[in-house]
């Protein structure tokens, strides 16, 4: 998985940047998204507030904003064409590679790590996986959706070795 990571805050250690890269690659492998691309930007609460207002019409900062990329137009291709022209299938895979972008508030992550009694490292990993699942179509509006998403989230974090401390 290709992941572009930008730290707008200048406050995120190389260790956390590497962990973010590694855990997202691990989550991609667990969910069959290894050939996808995404971006992660670490932001302040102030920037998170601006983005939350712009994209979600919510007037407060939040921990992670997940912007799933959905092309405006579907590309319709005959299945027989894909079988007869494997290069076309490969080209479509490349075209459809970008899945979205996460904005993780470093300030919120620190606040929540303290509030929940676990490490900043664990909270940053949690937010990366949580956002990753959102841009891959998971949500938690209903009890059923929540059970599915949170179950997979915990499975990924535990298998990666990032448990609640």
Curated annotation (Swiss-Prot):
PROSITE patterns: UPF0054 (PS01306). GO terms for cellular component: cytoplasm. It is found in: Cytoplasm. GO terms for molecular function: metalloendopeptidase activity; RNA endonuclease activity; zinc ion binding. One of its GO terms (biological process) is rRNA processing. It holds the Pfam family YbeY. Zn(2+) binds at residues 130, 134, 140. Its cofactor is Zn(2+). Keywords: Cytoplasm, Endonuclease, Hydrolase, Metal-binding, Nuclease, Ribosome biogenesis, rRNA processing, Zinc. Its EC number is 3.1.-.-. Binds 1 zinc ion. InterPro entries: MetalPrtase_cat_dom_sf_prd, YbeY, YbeY_CS. Single strand-specific metallo-endoribonuclease involved in late-stage 70S ribosome quality control and in maturation of the 3' terminus of the 16S rRNA. PANTHER family: ENDORIBONUCLEASE YBEY, CHLOROPLASTIC. Belongs to the endoribonuclease YbeY family. This is Endoribonuclease YbeY. It comes from Streptococcus gordonii (strain Challis / ATCC 35105 / BCRC 15272 / CH1 / DL1 / V288).
């Amino acid at each position: 998985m290709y992941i572009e990571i930008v730290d707008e805050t200048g406050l995120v250690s190389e260790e956390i940047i590497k962990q973010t890269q590694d855990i997202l690659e691990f989550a991609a492998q667990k969910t069959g998204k290894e050939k996808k691309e995404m971006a992660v930007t670490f932001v302040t609460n102030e920037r998170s507030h601006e983005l939350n207002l712009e994209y979600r019409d919510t007037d407060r900062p939040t921990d992670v904003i997940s912007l799933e990329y959905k092309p405006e137009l579907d590309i319709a291709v005959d299945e027989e064409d894909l079988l007869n022209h494997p290069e076309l299938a490969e080209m479509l895979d490349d075209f459809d590679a970008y899945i979205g972008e996460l904005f993780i508030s470093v300030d919120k992550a620190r606040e929540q790590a303290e509030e929940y009694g676990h490490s900043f490292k664990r909270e940053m990993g949690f937010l990366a996986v949580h956002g990753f699942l959102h841009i891959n179509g998971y949500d938690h509006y209903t009890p059923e959706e929540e059970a599915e998403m949170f179950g997979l989230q915990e499975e990924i974090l535990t298998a990666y070795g990032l448990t609640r401390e």
